[in-house]
Amino acid sequence: MNALLSIAFVLSWSSGFIGAKLGAGSASAVTILMWRFLPLAVILVVVAAVLGRASWRGLTGRDLARQAVIGTLSQSGYLLTVYYAIQLGVSSGTTALIDGVQPLVAGALAGPLLRQYVSRRQWLGLFLGVSGVVIVTMADATAATGVAAWAYLVPFLGMLSLVAATFLESRSRTPVPPSVALTVHCGTSAVLFTAFALSTGAAAPPAEAGFWAAIGWLVVLSTFGGYGLYWMILRRSGVTKVNTLMFLMAPVTAVWGAFMFGEPFGAQTAIGLVVGLVAVVIVHRGGGASRTRAIRRRPKTGGSPQQVAHTLPACPAPKPPDSGHRLSGGCP
């Protein structure tokens, strides 16, 4: 099951780059994002009101506000920077490379922020993953001409936004059903992108059929599949493992682009894909066992600190949502 979820996640997340390219020729980034999330948010709110009321019980305003912040970081901030970078002329390969740094950043911060143990095998896999992404995208990045240097900082900011959302979710103590999280995230993104589009005069959608085909692509594959599976795998396997799968996005996108758009796919891309696969295997095999570590904790009643044996799981283990409302196909 974990392997199938991982494969579905990689394909769904990679589809976002393909969908962005499909829509880039017909509308601006903010127009695409507004019409991607506005109808989706309406549908999700209606479904939640009719079928998913039980999933919302017990959640406080603070819980929902936290999810709104997570949605702002993981959807609005991340996607706007990716789409805007492509609009500025940064290639999809270079954007994927910068996004590929995310697992290394998240893995490095998992220890001090979440007190999670990252093994040497996992670090090896993380560095191999970076190498694989670099191999795939290096030629494309060096060949780019006419792109301002500051434009390459845009997807980097998006990567940091997604890292921040990942850690904010991992530190949440209240379990939020994926269906609820998806609704809040998409609703937040719809409000932000609509406000942005209206304020910049970019709200009117083009009449081209290709635009609406791209919107449908992004809603079904990238939104329901990509983000939903991201949070689902995060809760099942932890920060290090879920982010290591991000290393496969650039190679998979390169293969997909070769078949769909006729983009070149040579030996360098094939080598990078193999290295990325090896990295994922190393990390997933190296993190199977949890490590028991003694941490010092001061009792509330005072007195000297005491040593408490504490098993560090791969990720905080929230209670699973009610099975009747569990998101089976993914989310944004």
Can you describe what each PLM-predicted range is?
Residues L33-W35, L79, T94-V101, F167-V191, ...:
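Helix-helix packing/entry segments at the starts of transmembrane helices
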Residues M1-M34, L40-V42, T81, A144-R171, ...:
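Glycine-/small-residue-enriched transmembrane alpha-helix faces in small-molecule transporters
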Residues G58, A96-D99, R115-I135, T145-Y152, ...:
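Loop-to-transmembrane alpha-helix entry segments
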Residues S12, G16-F17, V45-D99, I135, ...:
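Specific transmembrane alpha-helical segments of multi-pass solute transporters/efflux pumps
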Residues L44, L109, V118-D140, M159, ...:
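Hydrophobic transmembrane alpha-helices of multi-pass small-molecule transport proteins
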